[in-house]
Swiss-Prot record:
Keywords: Carbohydrate metabolism, Cytoplasm, Glycosidase, Hydrolase, Polysaccharide degradation
GO molecular function terms attached to this record: chondroitin hydrolase activity
Activity control note: Partially inhibited by divalent metal ions such as calcium, copper, iron and mercury.
Active site: D88 (nucleophile), D149 (proton donor)
Family: Belongs to the glycosyl hydrolase 88 family.
Subunit structure: Monomer.
PANTHER family: HYDROLASE, PUTATIVE (AFU_ORTHOLOGUE AFUA_7G05090)-RELATED
Protein's name in the database: Unsaturated glucuronyl hydrolase
Principal cellular location given in the protein's record: cytoplasm
Length: 377
């Protein structure tokens, strides 16, 4: 059922390997070509993750060789501390170094992932009880700020805690996850993109947005980060409240999916042709639904409901948004949005959308769960 879609992604990736060389794709800019960078952006781990997924599925050395080169690049980036003053270290190193460890049990990759976890730990602000999202400590705008994306960065810390036996990684990750649950998720199970706290004492100030439509609206990719992020943290922490939050957010999301199965970029905007979609939000959510289902008993009626919803979502992406391996396209799925209000790639390829689309396909086809936790955990 999914093999043709996976084959298209494999073919596109093989071509991209030759085109991109040692550079990393981020988003497209209105064309069918990716804008590349030299491993300086927050999204670069997704390219590495795609290559590891392709290698796991095929055993083809071209994907492995490309993936190993990316890990070497991430080692250099950490040594230089280049554009790492943010919480997305988890995205960057879970899908590169930690992926190599999971696939090959390479000790140097494991050490690199642990070193990256230590860098992420430096962003813990004990007085506020948060992992600061962006900027240096004491930043006047961002010093007490969290964003919902961070839930996908916490698995790097939780994995590091299991690998080393040091409870501090888990303590920090759990504290941040629980504070995110309390303040980022609204009473109706929608979500804020970002929340501000007093950096000196952790008192709540206000919720807001950076990439959503309004402070009070629900940015669909943020909701998707919450669905998958709370589910992943539940797997590590065994916290039923986190899993229940993921389920509630998933129900909220699914109740607002338009007829063709792929969401618009914000739940507040009109569902009409002139509004932008965000295919990446749907791809992330598909992975989150499958992760939730994997933690439910087979007797739970919602388990199959979430699996069916994930299949419906991936089918909608495959049939209405996915590119075919025709020699031209560089992305897997069209109509992703990066920053609509900012006018940055509002209707384009996104490398994270491509990664989660492929992860969802491989979860459905082979049970491959990505690189957020050890296999068989």
């Amino acid at each position: 059922m999914w093999q043709q879609a996976i084959g298209d992604a494999l073919g596109i990736t093989a071509r991209n390997l030759k085109k991109f060389g040692d550079r990393f794709p981020h988003v497209s800019d209105g064309s069918n070509k990716y804008v590349l960078n030299d491993n300086t952006d927050w999204t670069d781990g997704f390219w590495s993750g795609i290559l590891w997924l392709c290698y796991e599925y095929t055993g083809d050395e071209q994907y492995r060789e490309g993936a190993v080169r990316t890990v070497a690049s991430f080692r250099e980036r950490l040594d230089r501390f280049e554009n790492l003053d943010h919480h997305d270290i988890g995205f960057l190193y879970s899908l590169s170094a930690k992926a190599q460890w999971i696939v090959e049990k390479d000790e140097s990759a494991r050490k690199l992932a642990l070193d990256a976890a230590d860098v992420l730990m430096r962003r813990w602000r004990a007085d506020a009880g948060i992992i600061q999202a962006w900027g240096p400590k004491g930043d006047p705008e961002n010093g007490g700020r969290i964003i919902i994306d961070c839930l996908l960065n916490l698995p790097l810390l939780l994995w590091a805690g299991e690998q080393t036996g040091d409870p501090e990684y888990r303590r920090v990750a759990e504290a941040h996850a629980l504070k995110s649950r309390r303040f980022l998720v609204r009473g109706d199970d929608s979500s804020y993109h970002t929340f501000y706290f007093d950096p000196e004492n952790g008192n709540a100030i206000r919720g807001g947005t950076h990439q959503g439509n309004t402070d009070g609206s629900t940015w669909t990719r943020g909701q998707a980060w919450g669905i998958y992020g709370f589910a992943l943290n539940s797997r590590y922490l065994g916290n039923a409240d986190l899993l229940e939050t993921a389920k509630r957010m998933a129900r909220h999301f699914l109740a607002r999916v338009p007829e063709d199965g792929v969401v618009y970029w914000d739940f507040e905007v009109p569902q009409e042709p002139s509004s932008y979609r965000d295919s990446s939000a749907s791809a992330i959510t598909a992975c989150g639904l499958l992760e939730i289902a994997s933690q439910l008993d087979e007797s739970d009626p919602e388990r199959q409901r979430f699996i069916d919803a994930a299949k419906t979502t991936v089918t909608a992406l495959r049939d209405g948004y996915a590119e075919r391996d025709d020699g031209e396209a560089e992305g897997f799925i069209r109509r992703g949005s990066y920053h609509v209000r900012g006018g940055i790639s509002p209707d384009d390829y996104t490398i994270w959308g491509d990664y989660y689309y492929l992860e969802a396909l491989l979860r459905l086809e082979r049970g491959v769960t990505g690189y957020w936790y050890e296999r068989g955990r």
